[in-house]
């Protein structure tokens, strides 16, 4: 089947090139100005085929430089969960642009954004960054100060942004609780010392978690409520229970990174699976693509932030900010907060989330019916509006299981095949997501094109 997938990829890539000549020519010219012809490397790397040049989007669709229309199920890797040009967010952006984008001062929108975030995720106090990477950076710094410790625990298959300390992978041996096995960097350019205070455990392994916490040096346990960068791996109830009971008992903080799950279900995985975090982080789609990251925390941790504001390192006072190393000049800007208020209040509502969940169930059932029709031993799973092609019969429990269920040649062939049929599919390590702008007809269109691909794959 892999050989057949590669054959489909070759054929469909040629067809894709014939449909996108203007994008291709633009990329040739752009290589004189930008590495690989793109302003950010992921725009090539994540697609695993030449990208198109986008010119506009509306609702659940976007158009490229050649005039091709695509039904979007990638949602820009969760940053466009609201859909393109969402009317409430567009109106908020236009209004704020006329008032001023940033003041390096609070604006009135901040209080309402905090209230709306508390409604969804439960935590009472909030700070803002420009990305989820920034949010996780600030959360870890807060955890180190609050606990007086340095070690951070993360899990195989995770992704928490471009933060040096957590761009490492390994598999933890739970048999003796001693760790080991070494770490491998997830990317080039990291400080080799940045992984010195991190351990990578096996997701859903409560015994490994318990053993590592027993060493008494952990500042924070950072996890996604469901793994989303190696397919979709859901947490087992006993794992959730262990995290809730044992992290805090060991003197550490539990940080739940909702960036990829925050709008799949209302309240994200935190509410859906029953996590009880000390800190919640998020970002990406909150403001409809306007840069933002969020850090939610308990009142006690807010007190830690406030209590350290007066810290200074003993040098001549310069008027700079010292305290905990959080913040940034453009963090919590008026534009980001206005867009976030509109998104949280008018787009990502409980009623809308229920509708997206219903569409996600429609997508899951339709894809499973197509898989069963052609006789493949695959399963389709989902979390709310996010579905997952699982190219194995059994549900994955760990990151390693998740990666085993993502067969890249098949994913690559499916992505370019669907693009040629007017559907922009999710990137290989993710699954199709229903945006808040999508309709039942959009979901049915995805299912129909997916069925055509499966017919080709099994021919």
Question: Could you describe each region identified by the protein language model?
Answer:
Residues 1-459:
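Conserved N-terminal phosphate-binding loop of PLP-dependent enzymes in the Aspartate aminotransferase
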